[in-house]
Amino acid sequence: MSAHIIDGNLLSQQLRQDVATRAAALSAKGKQPGLAVILVGADPASQVYVRNKVKACEDNGLFSLLEKYEADMTEAALLARIAALNNDPAIHGILVQMPLPKHIDPTKVIEAISPRKDVDGYSVLSAGELLTGLPGFRPCTPYGCMKLIESTGTKIAGKHAVVIGRSNTVGKPMALLLLQANATVTICHSGTADLGYHTRQADIVVAATGRRNTLTADMIKPGAIVIDVGINRDDNGKLCGDVDFAAAKEVAGHISPVPGGVGPMTITMLLVNTIEAAERETN
């Protein structure tokens, strides 16, 4: 029997209705939530991502400020612009689209964003808050993955979860969020011997490697929840994830597709974080 397909578009729409309601309530008090998005350079993929984020804001009652700069913008100029936005009361979240040109240090840029406005959840402070269980902004992609898992109705506590990937933006925070939900968590990566040994024991698998067919059907425990974070292209140029979806869906209990799974949820959780930032500022 085929797995239940976890529809990220549908869940995203449901969550965005709540975002729009909360945004309207804030706007009625004269406190419309505002997100500043900065794009440096003309990377085609980044332009698409930025356009989608701005449209999501506009569709759900948030104010968006899009600032585009040439690739030769200096690091000092970018840091100065972030400092100005930090002090702008109309802006509750600041997002600098990655990747940046090579002459700009991304860590410096992320750390320049006020912790109150770090709606991407990438700063060292945000990571520390997540690690210690303090309230803070969770990175949008892992946050969205958790919502997808929760939508299956599965009780996460006591389950064995395997996260494939250890990036600062997805793998590590994903493991921490699962740990907070009382799952038993294993982190696998490029240095892991016999990946399949670990994944076959997992009730929940999150694949976040950026490599096609990292997770194949024979590596999945029957009935497991499989969340595919990857964005890749197959031999025909068609969008695909890290999981061999066609075969995996015949073994898994629940599985997220690519596209239409994690992608829309990432932008939705950015909206949620921005709303939370505005609500904190207002309260």
From Swiss-Prot:
Q: What are the entry keywords? A: Amino-acid biosynthesis, Histidine biosynthesis, Hydrolase, Methionine biosynthesis, Multifunctional enzyme, NADP, One-carbon metabolism, Oxidoreductase, Purine biosynthesis
Tell me if Amino-acid biosynthesis is a UniProt keyword of this record: yes
GO MF term list: methenyltetrahydrofolate cyclohydrolase activity; methylenetetrahydrofolate dehydrogenase (NADP+) activity
Protein's UniProt keywords contain NADP: yes
Q: Which domain of life is it from?
A: Bacteria
Q: Which Pfam families match?
A: THF_DHG_CYH, THF_DHG_CYH_C
Record CDD domains: NAD_bind_m-THF_DH_Cyclohyd
Gene3D superfamilies associated with the record: Leucine Dehydrogenase, chain A, domain 1, NAD(P)-binding Rossmann-like Domain
Q: What Enzyme Commission number(s) does the record list for this chain? A: 1.5.1.5, 3.5.4.9
Q: What chemistry does it catalyse, as a reaction equation?
A: (6R)-5,10-methylene-5,6,7,8-tetrahydrofolate + NADP(+) = (6R)-5,10-methenyltetrahydrofolate + NADPH; (6R)-5,10-methenyltetrahydrofolate + H2O = (6R)-10-formyltetrahydrofolate + H(+)
* Cellular component annotations (GO), alphabetically ordered: cytosol
Pathway entry: One-carbon metabolism; tetrahydrofolate interconversion
Q: Which SUPFAM superfamilies match?
A: Aminoacid dehydrogenase-like, N-terminal domain, NAD(P)-binding Rossmann-fold domains
**Quaternary state and interactors:** Homodimer.
Write out the similarity annotation: Belongs to the tetrahydrofolate dehydrogenase/cyclohydrolase family.
Record's function text:
Catalyzes the oxidation of 5,10-methylenetetrahydrofolate to 5,10-methenyltetrahydrofolate and then the hydrolysis of 5,10-methenyltetrahydrofolate to 10-formyltetrahydrofolate.
The protein depicted here goes by the name Bifunctional protein FolD
Origin species, per record, is Herminiimonas arsenicoxydans
Q: Which gene encodes it?
A: folD
